[in-house]
Amino acid sequence: MVERVAAICDMQTELPLARVITILRYTDHLKAAGASVDRLLCRAGIPAVLLDHPEAAVPLPTAFRFGELSCQALGTEHLGLHVGLATSLDGLGPYGDVLKGCVTLYDYLRKGISLYNMLITGQHLWLSDHGESYG
């Protein structure tokens, strides 16, 4: 029994988290569209004061909930697409600076995934080799 308890204690469980910086572009877009950002944050369970702390973390399901509520508020399922199209690499701060230094698409994707894995925990992206293509 002691061995079983020790094995359970040794298992690492990773709490999926997202840095607040990942939702800031969404809040900017929502404000520009006239949506009540504070209300949406409150409904999702994200204290509005966290927007002043981009390196703070929120549970990933809470960030997803904010995204869902935001889509409903704007009447679109494509909010991420709209935000992505409206955001330049310059708008991503130091993360964008790293990506701007990429020479090839492959390098851009590898660095982008590396940065993503730094901003989001409990969820991982990677590239895998499938012959002459990557998936």
Name each model-derived stretch.
Residues 1-134:
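N-terminal low-complexity or simple alpha-helical regulatory segments
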